[in-house]
Amino acid sequence: MAGRSGVNDEELLRAVRVIKILYQSNPYPNSKGTRQARRNRRRRWRARQRQIRAISERILSSCLGGPPEPVDLPLPPLDRLTLDTEEDSGTPGTESQQGTATTE
């Protein structure tokens, strides 16, 4: 596969198969039982999903040789950046005076 150096495609495919088996081993819980029982099953399922996600990240990082590098995002020039005041709760051009007390 293009873009990788030193990583065997067979190793990567084997890692992906292992991760797929991990996720398939934890199906979503059924919807039978009381509300509390369903809630507990979903809570335990989410905890197992977090563990599977952590294991999957460790498998991929060991296979690929480290954490992925962040992608550089293209940013606009600073002179084109503006503050949008339409989303503010006050009227444009005025600042909110919350939390400031004026004592004379």
UniProtKB/Swiss-Prot annotation:
Instruction: Spell out the Polar residues composition-biased ranges.
Output: 25-34, 91-104
User: Pfam families annotated for this entry?
Assistant: REV
Provide the function of this protein: Escorts unspliced or incompletely spliced viral pre-mRNAs (late transcripts) out of the nucleus of infected cells. These pre-mRNAs carry a recognition sequence called Rev responsive element (RRE) located in the env gene, that is not present in fully spliced viral mRNAs (early transcripts). This function is essential since most viral proteins are translated from unspliced or partially spliced pre-mRNAs which cannot exit the nucleus by the pathway used by fully processed cellular mRNAs. Rev itself is translated from a fully spliced mRNA that readily exits the nucleus.
Name the protein family. Answer: Belongs to the HIV-1 REV protein family.
UniProt short sequence motif Nuclear export signal and binding to XPO1, positions renumbered to this chain: 73-84
**Where is it mainly found?**
host cell
The name this protein carries in UniProt is Protein Rev
In this chain, composition skew of type Pro residues spans 67-77
Task: Describe the processing and modification events after translation.
Answer: Asymmetrically arginine dimethylated at one site by host PRMT6. Methylation impairs the RNA-binding activity and export of viral RNA from the nucleus to the cytoplasm. Phosphorylated by protein kinase CK2. Presence of, and maybe binding to the N-terminus of the regulatory beta subunit of CK2 is necessary for CK2-mediated Rev's phosphorylation.
Q: Where is the composition biased (Basic residues)?
A: 35-48
Keywords (A to Z) from UniProt? AIDS, Host cytoplasm, Host nucleus, Host-virus interaction, Methylation, mRNA transport, Phosphoprotein, RNA-binding, Transport
Could you give the subunit structure recorded for this chain?
A: Homomultimer; when bound to the RRE. Multimeric assembly is essential for activity and may involve XPO1. Binds to human KPNB1, XPO1, TNPO1, RANBP5 and IPO7. Interacts with the viral Integrase. Interacts with human KHDRBS1. Interacts with human NAP1; this interaction decreases Rev multimerization and stimulates its activity. Interacts with human DEAD-box helicases DDX3 and DDX24; these interactions may serve for viral RNA export to the cytoplasm and packaging, respectively.
- Molecular function GO terms recorded: DNA-binding transcription factor activity; RNA binding
Q: Gene encoding it?
A: rev
Which species is listed as the source?
Human immunodeficiency virus type 1 group N (isolate YBF30) (HIV-1)
Q: Which GO terms describe its biological process?
A: mRNA transport; viral process
> Which residues are listed as membrane-spanning?
none
- Keyword tRNA processing belongs to the record: no
Q: What is known of its domains?
A: The RNA-binding motif binds to the RRE, a 240 bp stem-and-loop structure present in incompletely spliced viral pre-mRNAs. This region also contains the NLS which mediates nuclear localization via KPNB1 binding and, when the N-terminal sequence is present, nucleolar targeting. These overlapping functions prevent Rev bound to RRE from undesirable return to the nucleus. When Rev binds the RRE, the NLS becomes masked while the NES remains accessible. The leucine-rich NES mediates binding to human XPO1.
